[in-house]
UniProtKB/Swiss-Prot annotation:
Family: Belongs to the YqgF nuclease family.
SMART domains: YqgFc
The keyword RNA-binding is assigned to this record: no
Enzyme's top EC category: hydrolase
Assigned EC number: 3.1.-.-
One Gene Ontology molecular-function label: nuclease activity
Organism encoding this protein: Porphyromonas gingivalis (strain ATCC BAA-308 / W83)
Protein name (record): Putative pre-16S rRNA nuclease
A biological-process GO annotation: rRNA 5'-end processing
HAMAP family: Nuclease_YqgF (MF_00651)
UniProt keywords, alphabetically: Cytoplasm, Hydrolase, Nuclease, Ribosome biogenesis
One matching Pfam family: RuvX
Length: 138
């Protein structure tokens, strides 16, 4: 039984979150420099079984894809080629960064740590993963 791994893909950094082995509880995994992401995922998947990737899909308020898709789409192709046996599900990621910032603030995290963009990316990935877990039959 594999985990589900969520990806909040960014140009510089990518936040990652993963479920527990029973696929009930999402948790932050890490944030990695985007240029090392595929290598990180290869290493992680070699150690931990992953049964699905959940990739944040940036959309505008009118549900059209945002301009960020110009760099996310090529990554999704590379991800599918690198892991042909692991399906990819796309989840709407609108407002995840704002939600992550609010969550960090409400958790009482100190001001300096709240400015850490890597933490925001990781928490955003957790929110994307929770969104998938709430509605896996999308």
């Amino acid at each position: 039984m594999g985990r589900i791994l969520a990806i909040d893909y960014g140009r510089k950094r990518t936040g990652l979150a993963v479920t527990d082995p029973l696929k009930i509880i999402p948790g932050g995994l890490t944030t990695v420099p985007t240029h090392t992401l595929l290598d990180f995922l290869r290493d992680y998947v070699s150690r931990e079984p992953v049964e699905r990737f959940v990739l944040g899909l940036p959309r505008r308020m009118n549900y059209e894809e945002s301009e960020s898709m110009t760099y996310i789409r090529p990554f999704a192709v590379k991800l599918a080629q690198a892991f042909p046996s692991i399906p990819i599900t796309y989840v709407d990621e609108r407002f995840t960064s704002r939600m992550a910032q609010r969550t960090i603030l409400e958790a009482g995290i100190g001001k300096m740590k709240r400015r850490d963009k890597a933490l925001v990316d990781e928490v955003s990935a957790v929110i994307i993963l929770q969104s998938y877990l709430d509605n896996p039959d999308r």
